[in-house]
């Protein structure tokens, strides 16, 4: 009974993971599935942040709300970019994250904690691009 109840949720997650991966070799599909799940989590969490901030003090937090919404839209579009190339989605996501961090740092200042996220963001390219593209990761 539990399997039947969980099946629709599992199917949704599998669909998200598989989106845009058709036609790629198995190793690439595995990496793109991971990227799709990461992008979906980014889209979901940034949407939640935007909603929370908008419901609190929208006028004060307006720039942060919009940065989060734009980042959510970009992250949600990552599976579509796999049709361009296997690295396009990762490049777009990493670039958007770094630009968003710059925006958060500009808004909150250096003491706001956003600069600490650059340490976390430095590890993301290893997951997104894999060790096969070490030059791209280092760049």
Over which residues does each language-model region extend?
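Compositionally biased, intrinsically disordered low-complexity regions
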Residues: 22, 111-115, 132
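Phenylalanine-focused residue identity feature
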Residues: 2, 13, 24, 98, ...
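Non-catalytic regulatory/interaction regions at protein termini and inter-domain linkers
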Residues: 1-28, 116
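The cytoplasmic-loop to transmembrane-helix boundary for the fourth helix
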Residues: 128-139
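Hydrophobic transmembrane alpha-helices and their membrane-interface boundaries in multi-pass
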Residues: 33-111, 117-124, 138-139
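Short functional linear motifs
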Residues: 28-29, 134
């Amino acid at each position: 009974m539990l399997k039947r109840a969980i099946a629709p949720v599992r199917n949704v997650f599998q669909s998200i993971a598989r989106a845009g991966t058709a036609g790629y070799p198995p190793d690439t599909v595995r990496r793109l599935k991971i990227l799709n799940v990461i992008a979906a989590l980014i889209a979901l969490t940034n949407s939640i942040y935007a909603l929370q901030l908008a419901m609190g003090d929208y006028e004060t937090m307006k720039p942060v709300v919009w940065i989060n919404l734009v980042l959510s839209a970009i992250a949600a579009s990552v599976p579509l970019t796999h049709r361009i190339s296997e690295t396009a989605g990762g490049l777009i996501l990493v670039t958007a994250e770094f630009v968003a961090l710059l925006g958060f740092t500009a808004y909150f200042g250096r003491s706001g904690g956003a600069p600490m996220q650059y340490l976390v963001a430095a590890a993301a390219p290893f997951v997104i691009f894999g060790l096969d593209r070490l030059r791209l990761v280092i760049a």
